[in-house]
Amino acid sequence: MRRPVVMGNWKLNGSKTMVAELLTGLNAELEGVEGVDVAVAPPALYIDLAERLIAEGGNKIILGAQNTDINNSGAFTGDMSPAMLKDFGATHIIIGHSERREYHNESDEFVAKKFAFLKENGLKPVFCIGETEAQNEAGETEAVCARQINAVIDAYGVEALNGAIIAYEPIWAIGTGKAATAEDAQRIHASIRAMIAAKDAAVAEQVIIQYGGSVKPENAEAYFAQPDIDGALVGGASLDAKSFAAIAKAAAKMKA
């Protein structure tokens, strides 16, 4: 049985006050909740504060980050390395998010290098994939997802996916209020798992595949009722302790 993972991507949001209030509230909301891994990815400047607040709350929350470099040190202004992230206890690292791919011109191949470097450093990639609205309307969703995943498989082998998390995020559903139906999301998740299974069934069976794209407390149970949806990568709703905890509780309930 795959253990669900619900992760909050805070993106470029936060202040010291907000981080303290959010994590304190989340620690309280998650009291007694079992059967789900709950992670947060604050902006880099707040990872230190988040680490301390998570520890004060009894380490019920996993600390993550929103990006990494493909070097551990050197003349790379503005970047942060896996070694630095580990130093602050961050383990679940988002890579390949559509906003990074679009605004920072990150290619499939570059994202694959990040994936491999995280694994090499003992960290867990949260590997984002997904299609644009135009690609969706053209019926290219499965092909786009396969291309993005194959950038890792072709370079490092299907076994590289062991212990990783794949986050399917249809780009047209991120921050728009639109969302794929639970049935449509399940169809894509099943196709992703089948594509991996064609290369290695054991790897496909254990890999966590999250859904992301306007996941809210109101629709979370419908997603988690699907057999191939193993959690969620949550944006806006993760900035509210009650809403984010409700999504985590839905995962624990539906995957029990």
Swiss-Prot record:
Pathway: Carbohydrate biosynthesis; gluconeogenesis; Carbohydrate degradation; glycolysis; D-glyceraldehyde 3-phosphate from glycerone phosphate: step 1/1. The active site is at H97 (electrophile), E169 (proton acceptor). Keywords: Cytoplasm, Gluconeogenesis, Glycolysis, Isomerase. One of its GO terms (biological process) is glyceraldehyde-3-phosphate biosynthetic process. It is an enzyme of class 5 (isomerase). Substrate binds at N9, W10, K11, G175, S214, G235, G236. GO terms for cellular component: cytosol. InterPro entries: Aldolase_TIM, TIM_sf, TrioseP_Isoase_bac/euk, Triosephosphate_isomerase, Triosephosphate_isomerase_AS. PROSITE patterns: TIM_1 (PS00171), TIM_2 (PS51440). It is found in: Cytoplasm. Its EC number is 5.3.1.1. Its main location: cytoplasm. One of its GO terms (molecular function) is triose-phosphate isomerase activity. It catalyses: D-glyceraldehyde 3-phosphate = dihydroxyacetone phosphate. HAMAP family: TIM_B. Homodimer. PANTHER family: TRIOSEPHOSPHATE ISOMERASE (PTHR21139:SF42). Involved in the gluconeogenesis. Catalyzes stereospecifically the conversion of dihydroxyacetone phosphate (DHAP) to D-glyceraldehyde-3-phosphate (G3P). Belongs to the triosephosphate isomerase family. This is Triosephosphate isomerase. It comes from Vibrio vulnificus (strain YJ016). The gene is tpiA.
